[in-house]
Amino acid sequence: MDLITPDFGIIFWQTITLLFVLFILGKFGWKPILQTLKKRETHIEEALKGAEEAKQLLAQLKSEQEKLLEKSNREREKIISDAVATKNDILETAQMEARQLSDKVLKEAREVINTEKEIAFGKLKHEIFLISVQVAEKLLEKELNTENKQEELVRRLIKETHLN
């Protein structure tokens, strides 16, 4: 047991050595160690502040990105609606022009048909007139082949003209 319990001299010298080591550490070691710890603590705080600022910046950028996305979506919808409106206007204009052209062509066709119809009726009347004259000529030749009949017709025509 003697080996386990230290002597008074050993305790004394160990205490002196410990105090000397503490003095040396206090004089030369603690200040650099504390400064290093302080620097590390400051560095960690700055890193945390930087991380927080980065987080805020990221949130701000995300918010701006969402706003830009919304704006671009609105612009896209506006462009699409404008394009649809323009398409509808163009289609409506084209349909109206097609209708006008169709009406114009129909009107011209009707005019041509009416003109040709009038020409055909004129030719038909002329043909009927010529046929009537030929028939009348043939009838008159048959009826007026004698001189008595010719004189009788002339007298009758004179009487009718005086009466009218």
UniProtKB/Swiss-Prot annotation:
Supply the InterPro entries for this chain: ATP_synth_B-like_membr_sf, ATP_synth_b/b'su_bac/chlpt, ATP_synth_F0_bsu_bac, ATP_synthase_B_chain
Indicate how the chain sits in the lipid bilayer: Single-pass membrane protein
Listed under GO cellular component are: plasma membrane; proton-transporting ATP synthase complex
Keyword list, A-Z = ATP synthesis, Cell membrane, CF(0), Hydrogen ion transport, Ion transport, Membrane, Transmembrane, Transmembrane helix, Transport
Mind listing the GO molecular function terms for this protein?
proton-transporting ATP synthase activity, rotational mechanism; proton-transporting ATPase activity, rotational mechanism
- Membrane-spanning parts: 8-28
Please state where this protein is localized: Cell membrane
Q: What is its main location?
A: membrane
Entry-linked Pfam families: ATP-synt_B
Protein purpose: F(1)F(0) ATP synthase produces ATP from ADP in the presence of a proton or sodium gradient. F-type ATPases consist of two structural domains, F(1) containing the extramembraneous catalytic core and F(0) containing the membrane proton channel, linked together by a central stalk and a peripheral stalk. During catalysis, ATP synthesis in the catalytic domain of F(1) is coupled via a rotary mechanism of the central stalk subunits to proton translocation. Component of the F(0) channel, it forms part of the peripheral stalk, linking F(1) to F(0).
Q: Which family does it belong to?
A: Belongs to the ATPase B chain family.
Subunit details for this protein? Answer: F-type ATPases have 2 components, F(1) - the catalytic core - and F(0) - the membrane proton channel. F(1) has five subunits: alpha(3), beta(3), gamma(1), delta(1), epsilon(1). F(0) has three main subunits: a(1), b(2) and c(10-14). The alpha and beta chains form an alternating ring which encloses part of the gamma chain. F(1) is attached to F(0) by a central stalk formed by the gamma and epsilon chains, while a peripheral stalk is formed by the delta and b chains.
Q: What is this protein called?
A: ATP synthase subunit b
- Which organism encodes this protein? Amoebophilus asiaticus (strain 5a2)
